[in-house]
């Protein structure tokens, strides 16, 4: 099994520069402590050698056993960990551009990451908190990225990965063996696996749900795709061509929101029906991208559009907007503190 060594933080600038994504514009992590009124950069490296402000962030997540610990993955310089609420960061995996990661729900030292390395899509795992990493999946062809990875929370040895070419691949033994579950011939943007089932966000096709660990799937956005069901209120066009990110309420799995190229849609019945959510966007806005729902209330939602972060506290009737001043970059990831709902985090992608 191939081993991957951690790159020293001192080599960070070289790693990032080699990926052509490390520019002078502001990216990295932003944090709000006042419910989204304003956002501040939170990018200091733990050893004082610099910051992660130049990194393009792909995902942010809390340690499932300790919410003061956060992890952030980057498209250009690996995986980072903070033990003090994003005040300081340390690199625990370099060398591989990471698109997604997931932490074992009962063992925080076990972390799975997915992305691309040496021109191949790969999935890696550490079982010692990042001291060593092993490859558990390597794509058969070049130019294929592993875009998403998820664990079954009820049986974490079950792993799902989604490829850029559309293959959904499953393992029942922690990554020792794999089987092809579905082939969508369309990019898989995200896999979410919760106690209610597995959700696969396929870029131009829609959202699929499985309640039997990936043996069968139902398209839950079929009603949204039907002619006439997309809202005439959308300022971005008349047909959905990109399902971007899905957020499911932590307290009610039937409540979910999806960002698309036409705007924001929500369902209160697990995807049986969908409603368009009007946001204060302009014709010059980008389509909504990142989205997060607060644990404390599924009426509290953060949504990004370009470098603007919108917040609603009433499920989408009224919105406030905060300019993150991220130099026109894209807010690509959002996360709300499960214990302190006034605290939230944003990951910036440098465009």
PLM regions and their residue ranges:
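Extracellular glycan-interacting surfaces
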Residues: 2-351
